[in-house]
């Protein structure tokens, strides 16, 4: 029994520290302005940084979900069309659910890696891997 406890303690010591942290993850809110027939997301790069994702990847998802064209300009994103901040934040929540949160442990400590031609969501907390749909 003592040997089992020693092995268990050794295994626990080898786990990454993220496993034991219990901080709450909040989905960042996007702040947008509508000017003419374009929508400007003012804090887009900050949102992407908070999600620990490439801004181009987040933008590509948003553009596909909203069915529009757009681009990055500095720290903001410009979308062709009029979109409310409510709709944009709703689509960001969809992005977080599909491309940020681990499907096993529900933590945001993930990275998108590429193995061969497949994109994989790898969790830094539990080590789980899950294939992702390509954008």
UniProtKB/Swiss-Prot annotation:
Domain of life where this protein originates: Archaea
Keywords: Initiation factor, Protein biosynthesis
InterPro entries: IF2/IF5 (IPR045196), TIF2_bsu_arc (IPR004458), Transl_init_fac_IF2/IF5_dom (IPR002735), Transl_init_fac_IF2/IF5_N (IPR016189), Transl_init_fac_IF2/IF5_Zn-bd (IPR016190)
SMART domains, sorted: eIF2B_5
Molecular function, one GO term: translation initiation factor activity
Family: Belongs to the eIF-2-beta/eIF-5 family.
Protein role: eIF-2 functions in the early steps of protein synthesis by forming a ternary complex with GTP and initiator tRNA.
Self-association and partners: Heterotrimer composed of an alpha, a beta and a gamma chain.
Protein name listed in UniProt: Translation initiation factor 2 subunit beta
Organism: Methanobrevibacter smithii (strain ATCC 35061 / DSM 861 / OCM 144 / PS)
Protein's gene: eif2b
């Amino acid at each position: 029994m003592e040997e089992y406890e020693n092995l268990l303690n050794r295994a626990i010591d080898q786990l990454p520290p993220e496993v034991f942290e219990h901080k709450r993850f909040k989905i960042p809110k996007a702040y947008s302005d509508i000017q003419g027939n374009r929508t400007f997301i003012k804090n887009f790069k900050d949102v992407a940084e908070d999600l620990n994702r490439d801004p181009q990847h987040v933008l590509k998802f948003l553009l596909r979900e909203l069915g529009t064209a757009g681009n990055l300009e500095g720290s903001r994103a410009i979308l062709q069309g009029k979109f409310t901040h409510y709709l944009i934040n709703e689509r960001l929540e969809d992005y977080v659910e599909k491309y940020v949160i681990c499907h096993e442990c529900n933590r945001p400590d993930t990275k998108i890696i590429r193995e061969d031609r497949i994109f994989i969501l790898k969790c830094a907390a539990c080590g789980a891997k899950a294939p992702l749909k390509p954008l």
